Amino acid sequence: MMSYLKQPPYAMNGLGLSGAAMDLLHPSVGYPATPRKQRRERTTFTRSQLDILEALFAKTRYPDIFMREEVALKINLPESRVQVWFKNRRAKCRQQQQSGSSTKTRPAKKKSSPTRESTGSESSGQFTPPAVSSAGSSSSSSSSTNNTGISSTSTSISTVSSIWSPAISPGSAPPSVSLPEPVAPSNTSCMQRSVSGTASSTYPMPYNQTTGYSQGYPTPSGSYFSGVDCGSYLAPMHSHHHPHQLSPMTASSMPTHPHHHISQSSGHHHHHHHQAYSGTGLAFNSSDCLDYKEQTASSWKLNFNTTDCLDYKDQASWRFQVL
């Protein structure tokens, strides 16, 4: 009646008659299209059958196919039942030995509890240790994925660092004028780089040095150097003068430019501000600023980019853009 309760009460267009509902109409006929595989009933051994099996087990724990066939004929059971009985009997013997030494009692109990059950009983015991090992491997793999996630975040940080880099790219300057600074990316800080002009390839330094820059200038250079606002800050500036550099300013489309490209724009940027605002009157690099018409420091505002200093007359009209 269980199969009848699981079936819908009416046949849907005659489809419900196949399967277990047919077994109700013809209970004597077995149909292979049952919805669920029926569990095989347990084989119950009589005392005489067990005596014969135990006698063979005393002789050998691993009987070959011929010995199993012979015993199966004696006890009037199929050979597969004899094979499963020997398998479970060996498992029971192992469990007794392990319980004597009190090691691995739990998985052994799973093996030994059904002495005469088929292979499902032992497979349940056999699958528990691989589950533990697979859990260990999954934890190790998760830790490895964590490591790779960390490394990927670091690499993403390094790629984000390239948002700033294409400030003094040869795209704005003529290709013949190659910059001497970005050839050797060193690990010097951005403050040192603003004086020495050496490129800095480390990502956090240009942004960690914002306080150093903000000491000299009252403008909010923290928002200027925030890692997220770099692309959105540089993009509107470059949209006025160099529309071909809009795409390098976005973080996603910047895989090709070198890393010292960012520190360059930041470093050179403030390099000139140190020269301009401190009043030292140092000459500008000819490679950085190719054709300045007005080099007075009063006309340059803080958002002055070295990419924009190629023959622009109206530096006084540029303002600092606070985002």
Swiss-Prot record:
It comes from the Eukaryota. Residues 91-155, 168-204, 239-277 are annotated as: Disordered. SMART domains: HOX. Pfam families: Homeodomain, TF_Otx. Gene3D superfamilies: Homeodomain-like (1.10.10.60). Residues 257-275 have a biased composition (Basic residues). Keywords: Developmental protein, DNA-binding, Homeobox, Nucleus. Embryonic expression is highly dynamic. In early gastrula embryos, expressed in the involuting presumptive anterior mesoderm. Found in the head rudiment at 9 hours of development, and at 12 hours of development expression increases at the caudal side but decreases at the rostral side. With the extension of the body axis, expression extends to neuroectodermal regions fated to become fore- and mid-brain; detected in the presumptive border between the midbrain and the hindbrain at 18 hours of development, and found in the diencephalon and the midbrain at 24 hours of development. It is found in: Nucleus. InterPro entries: HD, Homeobox_CS, Homeodomain-like_sf, Otx1_TF, Otx_TF, Otx_TF_C. Residues 128-155, 168-178 have a biased composition (Low complexity). This is Homeobox protein OTX1 B. It comes from Danio rerio.
